[in-house]
Regions:
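Residue-level signal for inorganic ion chemistry
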Residues: 23, 46, 69, 96, ...
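Short beta-strand-loop/turn "lid" adjacent to the catalytic site in phosphate-handling enzymes
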Residues: 59-94, 119-128, 157-178, 201-204, ...
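N-terminal glycine/serine-rich phosphate-binding loop of ATP-dependent small-molecule kinases
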Residues: 1-89, 101, 117, 145, ...
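Active-site core segments that coordinate phosphate-bearing ligands/cofactors
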Residues: 5-7, 100, 107-120, 124, ...
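Conserved beta-strand and immediately adjacent loop positions that scaffold enzyme active sites
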Residues: 15, 77, 173, 246, ...
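Glycine-rich phosphate-binding loops at beta-strand->alpha-helix junctions
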Residues: 13, 204-212, 228
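Gly-rich Lys/Arg/Thr-decorated short loops/hinges at beta-loop-alpha junctions or inter-strand turns
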Residues: 34-41, 114-115, 165-172, 196-198, ...
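A generic structural motif
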Residues: 31-32, 94, 288
């Protein structure tokens, strides 16, 4: 029976699964890595931390010759590589909000209506295109060294194979893909004066994109499929592959997701329209701080504890938290409030509130935020 290796490069950590062809989990491993916040609203990681985590997980799985490998992970991030394939600077992540001016620059250079017609989305601070412009505007020395721009999961593909490649679902979140035609937009790249050779070949999610080069605990020659952005990949796994089926996924962010009949721009700007991993299209509403809000709460109010105590105290608190309300906009927000400057807060706090009330209010704030997006 075939054995398949799945790799997920998340924001808080990576996960690797060994599956059989029926989808049964044979082995699994995970590893955490740090998140850097150099300034409020900024969010960065070292791509080497992703790679080291994936290597540890592959070693723990202990299967050197799976029949195929699939890659998924956090979307939108920008990994800048030089002519030697080395990382130029820490990656700017999906929840990094520093690029508001560059989003305005994109609309000014391309035209707001054309941007939305081509990409089916407004330029958003989390997307890759404004991050590339930010690097050009603010770190010209680093920008001058760039020869390739990858998404996070595609950096792992590169380290496994030596091949630069991406696929349609993740590339949709760059702000540079022609979403209806499912390939890079020369109009966007030309208007923004970006070198098309910096952006890798785009595959469909189910196409073979590369083969392992050997090392890192894996044999050479194992096919690596295109894979998918984390949300599209999760939707395939949960069956959200046809219109009328809705999925909700919770990680560092939270997403409400549904397949749609074709590419159509949401004129309210609240939902994204992307290529789906099943060769169709999908719409999704993204809330930036879901599990991320809980991790912040754990690290801040429960230092040294795992989530078990946090969950226990939150469960013991009364629904409504005696009037305490938490707004979970810790890194700005996208859906339905597209505002990178939005910030979280507690309101209704009084002396009678306990740590458990604070914990439960975070859960409730996340739940109502997702309902707001729905």
């Amino acid at each position: 029976m075939a054995k398949l290796l799945g790799i997920d490069v998340g924001t808080s950590g990576c996960k690797v699964l060994l599956l059989d062809e029926q989808g049964r989990v044979l082995r699994q491993a995970s590893a955490e890595y740090p998140l850097s916040v150099p300034q409020p609203g900024w969010s960065e990681q070292n791509p080497e931390d992703w790679w080291n985590g994936v290597q540890r997980c592959i070693a723990e799985i202990g299967e050197p010759n799976p029949d195929a490998i699939g890659v998924t992970g956090q979307m939108h991030g920008s990994v800048f590589l030089d002519s030697e394939g080395s990382v130029v600077r820490p990656a700017l992540l999906w929840n990094d909000q520093r690029t508001a001016a560059e989003c305005e620059e994109i609309d000014a250079r391309v035209g707001a209506d054309r941007v939305r017609a081509i990409t089916c989305n407004p330029p958003l601070t989390g997307f890759q295109a404004p991050k590339v412009l930010w690097l050009r505007n603010h770190e010209p020395e680093a920008f001058g060294r760039v020869r390739q721009v990858l998404l996070p999961k595609d950096y792992i593909r590169y380290r496994l194979s030596g091949v630069y490649a991406t696929e349609v679902s993740d590339a949709s979140g760059t702000g540079l893909l022609d979403v209806p035609s499912r390939n890079w937009s020369s109009e966007m790249l030309d208007a923004l004066q970006l070198d098309s050779t910096w952006f890798p070949r785009v595959y469909e999610s189910d196409e073979a994109s590369a083969k392992t080069s050997g090392g890192s605990g894996l044999a050479a020659g194992i096919p690596i499929v295109g894979g998918g952005g984390d949300q599209a990949a999760a939707a395939v796994g949960t069956g959200a592959v046809a219109p009328g089926i809705l999925s909700v996924s919770l990680g560092t962010s939270g997403v409400v997701f549904t397949a749609i009949p074709g590419p159509e721009y949401d004129r309210a700007g609240a939902a994204h329209t992307f290529c789906h991993a099943n060769r169709g299209w999908h719409a999704m509403g993204v809330m930036l701080s879901c599990g991320g809000a809980l991790r912040w709460l754990r690290d801040t109010l429960y230092p040294g504890d795992d989530y078990a105590l946090l969950n226990e105290e939150a469960a013991a608190a009364k629904p409504g938290c005696d009037g305490l309300t938490f707004l979970p906009y810790l890194t700005g927000e996208r859906c339905p409030h597209n505002d990178p400057a939005a910030r979280g807060s507690w309101s209704g706090l009084h002396l009678g509130h306990t740590r458990g009330d604070l914990a439960r209010s975070v859960f409730e704030g996340v739940c109502f935020g997702l309902r707001d997006g729905l």
